[in-house]
Structures are given as C-alpha cells and as structure tokens.
Regions:
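Acidic, low-complexity cytosolic segments
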Residues: 1-30, 37-166
Length: 166
C-alpha cells in the first residue's frame, strides 16, 4: 500500500473541486474517497445522515469481501459495486490499487448516470493523488505510522544510559 498523501488546505480544495463537479453532474448526494483500509481521504456532499468514519470502514470491508469473492471465480477484483435500497443507493468504484470512491444517491438520479460520471471522477482523483504523493510537501504518512504503540511512552534506555561512568 502506498503512503497516504499529506493534504494541505489547497490539496483538499482541489479534491473538493473534483468531487463537487462529479456530484453536480451525477446528481448524487455524497461522495467519499477512502483508502483500502477504510481511512477517509476526502468527502463532499451531505454528510448529515451518517457517521462518515464508520461508513468508510464498513465500505472498505465490503469492497475487500467482494474482492475475495471475485478471486473465487477467477477475477482479480470487481472494480465497482452497487447496493440498491428502497430510497438510497450506494455505488463504490476503484480509483486505483489503494483507493475507493463511494457515492450515495437517491431517486433523483440513476445508477447509470452515477457510474458514467464516476469513471472520469475516479481518474481525476487518481491523477491528483499521484501528483500529491510525488510532491509530498516534504511530509509522508504511511500505514506503519498507524500503530497501537503508546505515543508518550518513555523510550527504552540506551546502552550509554545503562553503563555506569568510571
């Protein structure tokens, strides 16, 4: 898994522009860009109806489970998933090897319209994230940076600190 790019306010504004344009064209309600681990990279739209963090984690799990189902029938993965509800629907598509775009929409649009515009939006998001990873602002955040280790623990004593002075 590639490193998660560190996003500045300007970077977020660029992502918001891509996602906002997509939502307008697709007439969808919400789009969220996540990594395959379920971490939110960017979001745009009406987020008042759900906890985005939990939503992202569950969507990543669903995408991972479907990836395994695809492998069981000889496919590498399914690059898109559609969940149809009575009033709300969800379309998930792969942005790249590390990223997923989730779109929530209602009855005022169709899955075909969402799917059509999501292809271009996913490509734009992928290109933008690749550019940000190359640029990096001199900062990097990798999956190894996420750990259960205590942040404020005293470091282990060094050999110099343990050896008595003569």
């Amino acid at each position: 898994m590639n490193s998660i790019p560190v996003l500045t306010v300007k970077d977020v504004a660029m992502l918001d522009g891509v996602l906002g344009d997509f939502l307008k064209k697709a007439e969808a309600d919400l789009t969220v860009v996540i990594d395959r681990g379920g971490n939110v990279i960017s979001q745009f739209g009406d987020m008042s109806v759900m906890d985005i963090t939990i939503f992202a984690a569950l969507a990543a799990g669903s995408f991972a489970a479907t990836r395994e189902l695809a492998r069981r029938i000889g496919e590498i993965e399914f690059n898109a998933l559609y969940h149809q509800g009575n009033g709300s629907h969800m379309f998930m598509n792969s942005v790249d090897d590390d990223t997923i775009m989730i779109t929530v929409f209602g009855p005022r649009t169709t899955v075909g319209l969402v799917r059509f515009y999501s292809a271009a939006a996913a490509q734009n998001v992928s290109n933008l994230l690749k550019t940000l990873q190359r640029g990096g602002h001199g900062l990097e955040f990798t999956a190894a940076d996420i750990s259960a280790a205590p942040i404020f623990a005293d470091p282990a004593p060094t050999a110099a600190a343990v050896t008595p002075a003569k």
